[in-house]
C-alpha cells in the first residue's frame, strides 16, 4: 500500500513520463552500464555528458558553471583530473573559458577567431536539433494540425537515464536533446506519422521494439545447438507429438550470407543486433534505428534502415541531427501531400503520380543513387532453353529489389508469386514481343459445308412442296377464303444461290395461286391425302 501511494505521489508531483520512484538513478542504486557485454554500446558515458571534457574546477570542488546546463540537470559531478597536457594552472583560465561560451559561438581558437571545421563526408556539420524541430513544428502546425497535436511533450532527464538503463547503452547527445523536445508521438490510432506516415517512437515504445528484435535474435538467430539444449526441457511434453517435417538446417547461414550494407562495411553483417536502437517504425516490421555498434567503416550513432524487408541495410544519415534536418528539408520542399482516403502524409519524390513509394523506400533509393548501386536484371519467368533441355542455368546473384526467396522458400511477407514457370512474358523482361505458346495450338478445322447453306437448301425444298388451297365450307352461301401459306422467317437468310432463284420461285408461286383460285374442292376428305 505504501508503494502504491509513493507511485501516485510521484506521478502527481513530477514531470517524469517513464521513470518511476524506484529508478536506480534516483535512489543511488545505479548498476553501471555494460553489465551485459553483449548489449552494451561501444562507448562510455562521456559521450552523453557535455561537461566531461572541462578540465577546470571551481573552488568548491564542483565543475564549471557549464555543468548546470547538461543532461544531468546540474547534478554535482565527481572531481576531474588536471588538464591532459599537464600544464600548470594560470589565473584567468576559468573566467576566459566561461566568457567564450557566453558568446554565440561554441568553439573559438586561442586568437579569438572562428576556426575552420572539418567537413564530414563532404558536408558541413548538421544544424542543431532544436532548429530542425522548430521547422518541423512550424510546418505541422500550419499544414497538418491534427498531426501536430499528436507530437508528445519532451521527456525529462530521469526518463532518459532510465531509458539508458533499460537498454544498457549510452545514447548520443543529439538523440537525448531530441527526446527532451518531443518524446515521440501519442498513440492516437491514426495510421500516420510525422516521419511521412512512419511513427516516431517514444521512450516506452523504443524499449518494446528493442525487446522484440532481441527476442528474434534469441529464438531464431542463435546457434542451433543452444536452441536444442533449451528445447530439451520440453521433450517430455512434445514426446507424443508428431515429428516436424525436415527443414533446411543451413537456413541461418544462408540468411546471414544475404546480409549486406550500403555503403559496404558500414554496418555489421547481421539480421538484427541488440545495439540497434529503434527510433522510427513503419507498419510492416521495418525500423530506422541508431547504430551503437557500427561496422569497420561506419560511425557511432549513425541512423540505419533495417527490418524484415531489408536484408541489405542502409545508412540513411550520419547522425540523428542529420536525419532531422533532412526530414525538415523534405517537408519544406513542397512535395508533400496527404492521402484523402487514409490521411497518410507522403512525399512525392518522383514526377509520375502513379508511383507513391513509402519514405523508407525513398531513403533506400537515395542511398542507391548516392553510392551508385543499381538493381540487377531480373530473371525472366518464361522457360529458357536450358530448362527445356533439362539443364539448370547457373545461379545469378540476388537483386536487392527482389524478394528474399530462394529454392521456393518464401520468407517475410506472404506475397502471391508463381511457384513454377509461366508462359506469360512481361514487357520489362527478355522475350517480350515473342508469340505466346498458346498461339501455336492447332485449332479444329471448320466443316467444308456451310451450315447456313444447308439450312437454306432445306427451306427451299420445303417451300417447293407447299401449295395453296381453298378452305372447304359446309354451306355454299359464304364466299370461299383463300388459304395463304406463310413463309418461314429463316427463309430470309438465304445464300447467294437462293437469291438468284428468287424470281423463279416468285413466278411459280403466282401461278400456283391463280390455279388454286380456280380449283374447287368437292370433298373435304381429300384434304387428308394432301401433303403439306
Swiss-Prot record:
One matching Pfam family: SMI1_KNR4
GO biological process: cell wall organization; fungal-type cell wall beta-glucan biosynthetic process
Record field: compositional bias (Low complexity): 381-393
InterPro entries cross-referenced by the UniProt entry: Knr4/Smi1, Knr4/Smi1-like_dom, Knr4/Smi1-like_sf, KNR4/SMI1_regulator
SMART domains with a match to the protein in the record: SMI1_KNR4
Biased composition (Polar residues): 447-457
Region of interest: Disordered: 374-532
GO cellular component, as recorded: cell division site; intracellular vesicle
Assigned keywords, A-Z: Cell wall biogenesis/degradation, Transcription, Transcription regulation
Basic and acidic residues bias locations: 475-516
GO terms, molecular function: protein-macromolecule adaptor activity
Function description: Involved in the regulation of 1,3-beta-glucan synthase activity and cell-wall formation.
Family of the protein in this entry: Belongs to the KNR4/SMI1 family.
Protein name, UniProt field: Glucan synthesis regulatory protein
Amino acid at each position: 500500500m505504501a508503494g502504491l501511494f509513493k507511485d501516485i505521489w510521484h506521478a502527481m508531483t513530477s514531470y517524469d513520463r517513464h521513470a518511476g520512484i524506484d529508478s536506480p538513478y534516483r535512489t543511488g542504486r545505479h548498476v553501471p552500464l555494460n553489465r551485459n557485454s553483449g548489449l552494451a554500446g561501444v562507448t562510455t558515458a562521456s559521450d552523453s555528458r557535455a561537461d566531461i571534457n572541462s578540465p577546470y574546477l571551481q573552488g568548491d570542488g564542483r565543475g564549471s558553471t557549464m555543468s548546470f546546463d547538461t543532461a544531468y540537470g546540474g547534478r554535482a559531478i565527481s572531481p576531474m583530473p588536471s588538464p591532459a597536457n599537464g600544464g600548470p594552472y594560470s589565473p584567468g583560465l576559468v573566467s576566459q573559458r566561461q566568457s567564450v561560451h557566453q558568446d554565440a559561438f561554441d568553439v573559438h581558437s586561442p586568437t579569438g577567431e572562428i576556426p575552420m571545421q572539418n567537413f564530414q563526408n563532404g558536408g558541413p556539420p548538421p544544424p542543431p536539433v532544436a532548429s530542425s524541430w522548430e521547422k518541423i513544428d512550424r510546418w505541422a502546425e500550419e499544414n497538418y494540425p491534427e498531426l501536430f497535436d499528436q507530437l508528445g511533450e519532451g521527456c525529462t532527464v530521469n526518463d532518459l537515464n532510465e531509458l539508458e538503463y533499460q537498454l544498457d547503452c549510452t545514447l548520443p547527445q543529439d538523440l537525448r536533446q531530441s527526446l527532451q523536445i518531443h518524446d515521440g508521438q501519442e498513440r492516437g490510432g491514426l495510421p500516420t506519422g510525422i516521419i511521412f506516415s512512419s511513427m516516431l517512437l517514444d521512450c516506452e515504445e523504443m524499449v518494446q521494439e528493442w525487446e522484440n528484435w532481441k527476442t528474434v535474435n534469441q529464438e531464431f538467430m542463435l546457434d542451433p545447438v543452444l536452441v536444442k539444449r533449451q528445447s530439451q526441457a520440453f521433450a517430455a511434453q512434445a514426446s507424443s507429438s508428431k515429428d516436424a517435417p525436415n527443414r533446411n538446417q543451413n537456413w541461418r547461414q544462408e540468411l546471414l550470407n544475404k546480409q549486406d550494407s550500403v555503403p559496404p562495411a558500414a554496418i555489421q553483417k547481421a539480421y538484427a543486433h541488440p545495439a540497434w536502437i529503434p527510433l522510427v517504425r513503419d507498419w510492416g516490421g521495418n525500423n530506422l534505428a541508431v547504430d551503437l555498434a557500427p561496422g569497420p567503416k561506419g560511425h557511432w550513432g549513425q541512423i540505419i534502415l533495417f527490418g524484415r524487408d531489408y536484408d541489405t541495410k542502409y545508412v540513411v544519415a550520419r547522425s540523428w541531427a542529420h536525419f532531422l534536418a533532412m526530414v525538415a528539408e523534405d517537408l519544406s520542399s513542397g512535395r508533400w501531400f496527404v492521402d484523402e482516403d487514409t490521411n497518410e502524409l507522403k512525399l512525392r519524390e518522383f514526377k509520375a503520380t502513379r508511383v507513391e513509394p513509402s519514405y523508407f523506400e525513398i531513403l533506400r533509393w537515395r542511398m542507391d543513387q548516392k553510392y551508385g548501386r543499381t538493381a540487377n536484371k531480373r530473371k525472366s519467368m518464361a522457360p529458357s532453353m536450358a530448362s527445356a533441355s533439362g539443364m539448370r542455368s547457373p545461379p545469378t546473384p540476388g537483386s536487392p529489389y527482389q524478394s528474399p526467396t530462394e529454392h521456393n522458400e518464401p520468407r517475410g511477407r506472404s506475397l502471391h508469386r508463381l511457384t513454377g514457370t509461366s508462359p506469360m512474358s512481361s514487357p520489362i523482361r527478355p522475350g517480350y514481343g515473342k508469340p505466346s505458346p498458346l498461339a501455336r495450338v492447332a485449332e479444329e478445322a471448320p466443316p467444308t459445308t456451310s451450315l447456313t447453306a444447308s439450312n437454306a437448301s432445306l427451306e427451299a425444298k420445303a417451300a417447293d412442296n407447299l401449295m395453296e388451297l381453298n378452305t372447304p365450307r359446309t354451306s355454299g352461301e359464304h364466299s370461299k377464303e383463300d388459304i395463304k401459306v406463310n413463309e418461314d422467317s429463316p427463309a430470309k437468310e438465304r445464300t447467294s444461290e437462293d437469291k438468284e432463284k428468287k424470281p423463279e420461285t416468285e413466278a411459280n408461286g403466282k401461278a400456283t395461286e391463280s390455279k388454286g383460285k380456280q380449283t374447287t374442292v368437292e370433298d373435304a376428305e381429300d384434304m387428308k391425302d394432301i401433303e403439306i
